[in-house]
Amino acid sequence: MMKKAFITGITGQDGSFLAELLLKKKYDVYGLIRWKTMNNFENVEKIMDQITFVEGDLGDQISLNKAVKKIQPDEVYNLGALSFVGTSWTQPIQMSEVTGLGALRLIEAVKDNAPNSKFYQASSSEVFGNTKNAPQDENTPFRPVSPYAIAKVFGYWMTVNYRESYGMFACNGILFNHESERRGLEFVTRKITDGVARIKFGLSKEIRIGNLDARRDWGYAPEYVEGMWMMMQQKKADDFVLGTGETHSVKEFIIEAFAQAGIDDWQKYIVIDKSFMRPAEVPHLVANPSKAEKVLGWKAKTKFKELVKIMLENDMKRIQAISKK
């Protein structure tokens, strides 16, 4: 029998990479898509015909019950969320509904309709927020500073609660920033590689950035979805931090991207724009992924410069094609 996996957020960066991985592993893949909205299928274009799409919404319990009951999945991956931290201050209620309560609705649907199914909750390094401890591991206290992070903390503890209360296989992956050529253009890394490519081909003169000094632990997304899958293959459900253990600033990312594009006077293209500053900034996130290494045998492979290269080359190709039109 083929294993069945049900993925929320399947059209996003992580969902699409996870779907590809599971298809390679001969899973039957089901993906939740929202009705009545414009779903962007760009990331799953090449595998559309191999996925069964199910309509539903993390804001609607009945649709989730129906989906889980019908599919009877072996594994459920909750990657669906409003994932851009910046907008969480302007839409805190919607953020909490989808990212926080959405996780609860889905695990509740699993408990009631497919209790033997394994459940993965996509947590985030943002839960550590304004932490005093570095690096951060599974025992670091949470100090969330954005509505997004607070919603993720709620989802995290609900997952732990269902594991402990009902004996469900439910695990949290606390993933540090992971990027790729499929990252949304609103995210700073992709904004930089897209912007550098536009400048290189004469389509733009500037990149507007908020905080140059924010430091993050950036890895390559396809490796992280493999980590998710590994967590779900364990005998016992547990929570894991995934990250590279290295930290770089936004400024370093900018310098590296411009250097790789062969532009040395990067300063003249960067405009500091206060509107991109967050009401509360997370200063310094860096992972201690030693538990994942020891227990799962998982390790981030793609180094910082290589990550910038992958993203920049993709955007250079894309923008070059646009500039020729």
Which residues does each predicted region cover?
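N-terminal Rossmann-like NAD(P)+-binding domain of SDR-like oxidoreductases, especially those catalyzing
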Residues: 1-178, 232, 302, 309-317, ...
